[in-house]
UniProtKB/Swiss-Prot annotation:
Belongs to the gluconeogenesis factor family. GO terms for cellular component: cytoplasm. The lineage of its organism: Bacteria, Pseudomonadati, Pseudomonadota, Gammaproteobacteria, Enterobacterales. It comes from Salmonella typhimurium (strain LT2 / SGSC1412 / ATCC 700720). The gene is ybhK. One of its GO terms (biological process) is regulation of cell shape. This is Putative gluconeogenesis factor. Its main location: cytoplasm.
Length: 302
């Protein structure tokens, strides 16, 4: 009997945020509706942060990034969704996609309904689910014991925080929990470690689902050095240990990383180490190379 391929899987789930999750989803977009992204909603910077401070609600920026990278049919709607205002006025720097998502959120019963409306408008087949449908922020305790509030401030810490948490305590989106329960393969990363990857793992229901799932789990490492000082100081082993500390169990079966990553201390896990860089932007994953590496990981995991 041949090993399974990605095309054989009924449910592939990827967790994270920022440009990293969008890149993973776009590399697997051939899976269509069998692909689900669980998206971080704690961003408090840029256009997203301004909207949250003014209007409240969840952070839409990471969701917009994922939708942008999943658009395969250019249209007036997609051009509008990707448009960013210039100039010096009140709208300067705002992304119209963020405003569209926020407007639909006001018109919908749930944020997930707003996302599905936009998915249909943009003809995006992959499922996208916010990690929580309630407003939440990332908080850290620094090495002096001080509370540091928000992703922007946490990324500016000089050293790794003692602890990270979500505030307030919010429930995970029930569809996100169900997606993990039903998954045949789970992917985490790439992305900014503290602010894109960890928030999903800090939700109790998602961590519990990750502890219980029998699905193989793969961590995809970054290709470039993190701009966040505290995250940049972490080794691959540090990151694996921290993720599993918050999940509560050793669950990551494989890592997919570039050739410059030190994997010498990674034990008892499958390591797929290959050239993954895109030719135009070296710190981004080439979609086909990433797809091939994930295929290789799945084959090796059996």
């Amino acid at each position: 009997m041949r090993n399974r391929t990605l095309a054989d899987l009924d449910r592939v789930v990827a967790l994270g945020g920022g440009h990293g999750l969008g890149r993973v989803l776009s590399s697997l977009s051939s899976l269509g509706s069998r692909l689900t992204g669980i998206v971080t909603t704690t961003d408090n910077g840029g256009s997203t942060g301004r909207i949250r401070r003014s209007e409240g609600g969840i952070a839409w920026g990471d969701m917009r990034n994922c939708l942008n990278q999943l658009i395969t049919e250019p249209s007036v709607a997609s051009a509008m969704f990707e448009y960013r205002f210039g100039g010096n006025g009140e709208l300067s720097g705002h992304n119209l996609g963020n405003l569209m998502l926020k407007a639909l959120d006001h018109l919908s019963v749930r944020p997930l309904e707003a996302i599905n409306l936009i998915r249909n408008l943009l003809k995006v087949d992959a499922q996208l689910i916010p990690m929580s449908e309630l407003p939440v922020d990332l908080m850290a305790i620094d090495d002096q014991g001080h509370e540091i509030y928000g992703e922007v401030n946490i990324d500016q810490l000089a050293t790794p925080p003692q602890e990270i948490m979500l505030t307030p305590n919010v429930p995970a989106t029930r569809e996100a929990v169900q997606a993990i329960n039903d998954a045949d393969l789970i992917l985490i990363g790439p992305g900014s470690f503290y602010t894109s990857l960890m928030p999903c793992l800090l939700l109790d229901e998602l961590a519990q689902a990750l502890r219980r799932t029998p699905a193989p789990m793969v961590y995809i490492g970054n290709l470039g050095r993190e701009l966040s000082l505290p995250a940049a100081s972490l080794t691959l082993v540090d990151k694996l240990a921290m993720m599993e500390q918050y999940i509560g169990k050793k669950v990551i079966d494989a890592v997919v990383v570039g050739p410059r990553v030190d994997v010498s201390a990674v034990n008892d896990r499958l390591v797929i180490q290959e050239v993954l860089e895109a030719s135009d932007i070296p710190y981004r994953h080439d979609r086909q190379l990433l797809h091939n590496a994930l295929e290789k990981a799945l084959q090796a995991l059996g």
